[in-house]
């Protein structure tokens, strides 16, 4: 199953449809099949998809980003470092890094996901980013992943510190809705699936009994934060 968007891109070459992606990433895959697997969502119903690579990438990125923050923010205690890491090691954080290399343009998704703009969904895009980094790790090792992540953090964030990077979207939204509607948001679990070691939660956010957002995450807290982020954006656009 070929990616039509990639095929029609003016940057694609016949022998390597991922030339521009690899250039943006700063790494050229030796095994293009590994790259294709990292970009293939399970909705394609192919023999190989990116779920196993996503599992590995989650662990690799947690280590790499934790190490980078440990060395960069020597003045932060464990609590602050954990908050900072939580802002990056999340669907929202990885989506931001993925979009820095236009990863969404290269994903292989089913026609139904294409119609529903699946390639833009944080749950799909962030998972593909984790899988991509796992592929780099398998071929080139931890040092190469570390270099790529450092470059992407510099490109994706104007400032990398606790004040500007980590924002408690739930608190920010609650303050806004109390001021604007005299109510606080409520959250409802829509779906919980997957094995214990790889859970996925889908939450919905309501304001005055109206659904404002839904989001998925690896924990209820992450999904709620993502919902709050979407709701904040929607309320800002409505002003």
From Swiss-Prot:
Q: Where in the cell is it found?
A: Cytoplasm
- Which catalytic reaction applies to this protein? Endonucleolytic cleavage to 5'-phosphomonoester
Listed GO biological process terms:
mRNA processing; regulation of gene expression; rRNA processing; tRNA processing
Q: What is its EC number?
A: 3.1.26.3
**Subcellular location, principal:** cytoplasm
Q: What are the positions of the active site?
A: 58, 130
- Please list the residue ranges annotated as the RNase III domain: 18-141
UniProt lists the family membership as follows: Belongs to the ribonuclease III family.
What the entry lists under PANTHER family is as follows:
RIBONUCLEASE 3 (PTHR11207:SF0), RIBONUCLEASE III (PTHR11207)
Name of the protein this chain belongs to: Ribonuclease 3
Coding gene?
rnc
């Amino acid at each position: 199953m070929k990616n039509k968007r990639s095929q029609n891109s003016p940057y694609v070459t016949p022998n390597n449809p991922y030339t521009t992606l690899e250039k943006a990433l700063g790494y050229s895959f030796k095994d293009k099949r590994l790259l294709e697997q990292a970009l293939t969502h399970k909705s394609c119903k192919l023999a190989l998809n990116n779920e196993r690579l996503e599992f590995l990438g989650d662990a690799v990125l947690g280590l790499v980003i934790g190490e980078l923050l440990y060395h960069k923010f020597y003045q932060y205690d464990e609590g602050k470092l954990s908050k900072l890491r939580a802002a990056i090691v999340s669907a929202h954080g990885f989506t931001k890094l993925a979009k820095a290399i236009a990863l969404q343009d290269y994903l292989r998704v089913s026609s139904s996901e294409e119609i529903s703009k699946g390639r833009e969904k944080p749950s799909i895009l962030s998972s593909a980013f984790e899988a991509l980094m796992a592929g780099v790790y398998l071929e080139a090792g931890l040092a190469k992943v570390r270099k790529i992540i450092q470059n992407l953090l510099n490109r994706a964030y104007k400032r990398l510190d606790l004040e500007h990077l980590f924002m408690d979207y739930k608190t920010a939204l609650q303050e806004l809705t109390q001021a604007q509607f005299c109510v606080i948001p409520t959250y409802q679990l829509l779906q919980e699936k997957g094995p214990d070691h790889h859970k996925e939660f889908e939450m919905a956010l309501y304001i005055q009994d109206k659904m404002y957002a839904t989001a998925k995450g690896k924990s209820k807290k992450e999904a709620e934060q993502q919902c709050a982020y979407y709701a904040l954006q929607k309320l800002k656009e409505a002003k």
